[in-house]
């Protein structure tokens, strides 16, 4: 696949969200993007639920989420959207699970989680949902792996994760669930563990070389990229924004040795990232001082270097993001206050 030139990338402003927010969750299904929950200007979780239609460039409000919450885990099962856990209006984790039927336009309560939790990582395969980790009411990280059986409407406990954590990144590849990073209380975890759905067992993979919070993970071809982030301050060490890039080779099963010349051009944490047209993209986030960034860059996997992209029209951090129809969408987040901006990075045909 021919990797596009950075000059061919452009940003486009799309219809803004109906209200400003942060920590909303995005999901693509049936060629549309759904935005669920989030926090308002006062940090109060919201019950908003909207769908974006790319043809009309329009957000349409749908029946409100029965339980207002932010930072929910979401997944699509055919024409149903499942919303799991998150933070409720009392600022505490919830155990509520709700399912929206797209054809009927209705919400239904489903069997609750075994314990209230926020920061759960969710993957789905063959109409089965797998929920890993989370943080409970006592602020302790969970090591639970639970599988939801849609036909029986019940959660079944599977082998616990070797490293308890919340806010991890998980993705499915074949019949394996890869779980990376996350946090325990305020501190970052560099554990990398893989659950085999068929053998129902966990394998520990080599740890992420650089431990940091607010980094991003992107998969592209047979590589997994761990990007940027914040090295947390402890005792005498100051917190530090990072340019670091670690790359895991899925075929060889190991982290590659990285030259400093392969690192990001700009130090950043809490940014938008995704794989787009054969390149790894990072945009916005928080940088030194700390300042909200507008800069964006694209990694060329053959040249092993980052190149500058056009800046984001609205500089911001803590955006929700999704790769959708060959675009990387940056939704909401924090600029000077909360933002309702929706912007798409795409490769122009010209």
From Swiss-Prot:
Query: What are the record keywords, sorted?
Result: Kelch repeat, Repeat
Q: Where are the Kelch repeats?
A: 1-31, 32-79, 81-127, 128-175, 176-222, 224-278, 279-326
Gene3D superfamilies with a match to the protein in the record: Kelch-type beta propeller
The reply to whether Repeat figures as a keyword in the UniProt entry is yes
> Which Pfam families does the record associate with it?
Kelch_1, Kelch_KLHDC2_KLHL20_DRC7
InterPro entries tied to this protein: Kelch-typ_b-propeller (IPR015915), Kelch_1 (IPR006652), Kelch_domain_containing_8 (IPR051746)
Say yes or no: keyword Repeat present: yes
- Name of the protein this chain belongs to: Kelch domain-containing protein 8A
Corresponding gene? Klhdc8a
